[in-house]
Amino acid sequence: MFLNKRKAIFLISVPVLIFILTINQAKSQIIKIVDGDTIHLNGEKIRFTGIDTPELKQTCLKDGIKDPCGVTAKQILIDKIANNNVECTSEGKDQYKRTLAECFVNNESLSSYLVRNGYAFAYRRYSKKFIPDEDYARINKIGMWSMDFDYPWDYRKSKKN
């Protein structure tokens, strides 16, 4: 009887263990942070919709001192994602064939997080969704709102000329 109980426990345990390992493997992701508003998720290039972050080479001025605000925006995203899984809701593709999406970590929008922390702007040309987050950061002088800066779209335009 004792042997049969051990055998039964073993026969039940093995499938349960395999199931748990399968779930953990399914959740593993390969994430590369390109910049503040672009990631590669399992090889797919994803551009966050509704926001725009400073370019990596872009700097801001705080009390007359250059601040690498583009690099800081990327680092804030790296820190927020850390070792968490990222879930994205696709909204189609852009002209560069990137997936346009809003992405989340622990059910929190990464776009909202970046805008609210003052290192992304509501990209009003495409969406009004993140304007309240931007207003909050601006009113409270959070992140780039405590500095002199060029909007990313103005910075890109100045580099084309």
Residue map of PLM features:
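Small beta-barrel nucleic-acid-binding modules, primarily SNase/OB-fold domains
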Residues: 2-161
